[in-house]
Amino acid sequence: MIARIAGSPKHQNSIRKVADIFPEVPILCHHMSGLNVNNSKELISNVMESSEYNNIYLKFSGYNYVLGANQRWNFPYDDAMWIYKEAYQNFGSRMVWGSDFPVVKFSSTYKQALETLRTYCDFISKEDKKKILGENMYDLINKLT
C-alpha cells in the first residue's frame, strides 16, 4: 500500500505521526504537499521537516498551485523554482514526478510539465532526475508485489 495524500503544509505534523506508526508504508504527498510561494517560512519548514522520514515522498508537481492562480501559464515557473530547489535539497531523490493531468491543461501543457523538471531544474542531478521521473515510482509499486 502507498498512502497518497493531497494535503497542505499544515497536515505535515499528522503525516509524520502516521509515518512513525507505519514506517513500512510509503507516504506520497501530492502537489508538493500544497506548498505555495506565498507560504510563511514556518509552513515551508514544516513540509521540509518531513524529509527526515525515509518513508515520506514528495510529489514533484503542482506548478500552478505553487505559483498561485494568478500566475498560471508562467512556464518554466522561474518564480517557483526556489521551492522545488529547497524541496530537492531536503528530500533528495525521494520525490516522484507527476503530470497533474488533467488539471495541468489549465496552466500548461503536458510537455511543459515534463520539461520543467527535465530541462529547467539544473540543480537536480541526471541520476536523481531518472529516479524522480519514474524509477522511484516503479520501485514503490514493486515493493507492493
Where are these regions (language model features)?
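Catalytic pocket-lining loop regions of alpha/beta-barrel enzymes
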Residues: 1-96
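Mid-to-C-terminal alpha-helical segments outside catalytic/metal-binding sites
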Residues: 58, 85-96, 105-145
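Short, active-site-adjacent cap segments at secondary-structure transitions
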Residues: 65, 104-105
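Active-site glycine-centered loops adjacent to acidic/histidine catalytic or metal-binding residues
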Residues: 100
